Swiss-Prot record:
Name of the protein in its database record: UPF0735 ACT domain-containing protein SaurJH9_1700
Domain ACT, first and last residues per copy: 75-150
Family (UniProt): Belongs to the UPF0735 family.
Source organism of this protein record: Staphylococcus aureus (strain JH9)
InterPro entries referenced in this protein's UniProt entry, alphabetically: ACT-like_dom_sf, ACT_dom, UPF0735_ACT_dom-cont
Domain of life assignment: Bacteria
Amino acid sequence: MMDNKDYKKFYLIREDVLPESVVKTLKIKDALKSDPTLSIYDAVKQFDLSRSAFYKYRETIFPVDDKMLDHREFTLILYVTDIVGMLARVLDVISKLELSVLTIHQSIPMEEKATITLSLNAKSKETSVEDVIGALRNLDYVSKVELISMSM
């Protein structure tokens, strides 16, 4: 079993909120990868970053590959009013957004309320998770939509 002190958490974070030195480190790594003749000394000089900053981050920051983004899987939970055809309405939105349904579960209604849990795959880069949540929130009889998990 892994010791807790050895466990490293990972985060997916947008580039525009990263410190400049981290972004430069990624650019340097990319430059070194695409030009094997480029030295670390010349690369850090080219991107105006200290070698110590480069060495600090180079083994801890990795870009998310475009191929990873091709298969975005996420799970949503919808809180809905129990009406006839509600699940069909939800699936119609999912179909229009060209998402693949991986799993689906509808709870037994209690006091005219139910939940629908959907695991979805968004292969299209044009469809963001925010777009999906927004489209489902706009449905009548949907009181709440929550993202409960996401993987790349």
